[in-house]
Structures are given as structure tokens and as C-alpha cells.
């Protein structure tokens, strides 16, 4: 699961996918 934009999030995730606040 991710946000509208794929960029660096605030979370420990291998793949930066989210709207900034990580929704992985």
C-alpha cells in the first residue's frame, strides 16, 4: 500500500512508496 506520490517516507521500508508518511 502506498500514497499518491512515491518518494522517501518517514518509516523503515526498503521501498520508498507513500505520501510522505509511509503507508506500507
Swiss-Prot record:
GO terms for biological process: lignin biosynthetic process; methylation. Pathway: Aromatic compound metabolism; phenylpropanoid biosynthesis. This is Probable caffeoyl-CoA O-methyltransferase. The keyword S-adenosyl-L-methionine applies. Methylates caffeoyl-CoA to feruloyl-CoA and 5-hydroxyferuloyl-CoA to sinapoyl-CoA. Plays a role in the synthesis of feruloylated polysaccharides. Involved in the reinforcement of the plant cell wall. Also involved in the responding to wounding or pathogen challenge by the increased formation of cell wall-bound ferulic acid polymers. Binds 1 divalent metal cation per subunit. It catalyses: (E)-caffeoyl-CoA + S-adenosyl-L-methionine = (E)-feruloyl-CoA + S-adenosyl-L-homocysteine + H(+). On the 2D-gel the determined pI of this protein is: 5.2, its MW is: 30 kDa.
Amino acid at each position: 500500500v502506498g500514497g499518491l506520490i512515491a518518494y522517501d517516507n518517514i518509516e523503515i521500508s526498503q521501498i520508498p512508496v507513500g505520501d510522505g508518511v509511509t503507508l506500507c
